[in-house]
Amino acid sequence: MVDIIHRIGIKASPTEVYAALSTVDGVAGWWTRETTGESKVGGVITVRFLDHGVDRQGPVTEKGRMDLEVIRLEPGKEVRWRVKAGPQEWINTDVTFSLSPADGRTVLVFGHRNWREAVESTAHCSMKWATFLLSLRELVETGSGRPAPDDMKIDNWN
């Protein structure tokens, strides 16, 4: 099994960071604006990534979609999702956000765990997760993140 792991500091309390991770509106503020569902244990959150065409002209097409079952919500400490639908290599992987206070900020340890193997898309997703974690930090620290479709583009896949 392969894991993607990142660590980031955020100038906010664990409670504030948790709010951005544990609600549909919070996730829509840093990952993708196209976020729907129920943010409760046993609920499913759906995230969609849309292509609006060159310069936002032309037809809108769906580039990606994931259904995430909410496995754990521990206020101020942890959020855990299990991928139930999406790209084949994502199915049954776990996405984890562990929060702890440190030196007047929150340290977030992120994991996208249990990939069956390291493939090219693992590298792409690792880099994209890093950009979305920076978006999360911007959202919590400034009130405005960079969710898709306004996220940082890193390669020809997005």
Which positions does each model-derived feature cover?
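A short N-terminal helical cap/helix-turn-helix that marks the beginning
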Residues: 143-145
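Short beta-edge strand/loop motif at the mouth of beta-sheet-based domains
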Residues: 5, 16, 25-65, 149-151, ...
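Hydrophobic/aromatic beta-strand elements that line small-molecule binding cavities or substrate pockets
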Residues: 6-8, 66-72, 93-100
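Helix-adjacent hinge/juxtasegments
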Residues: 54-75, 79-85
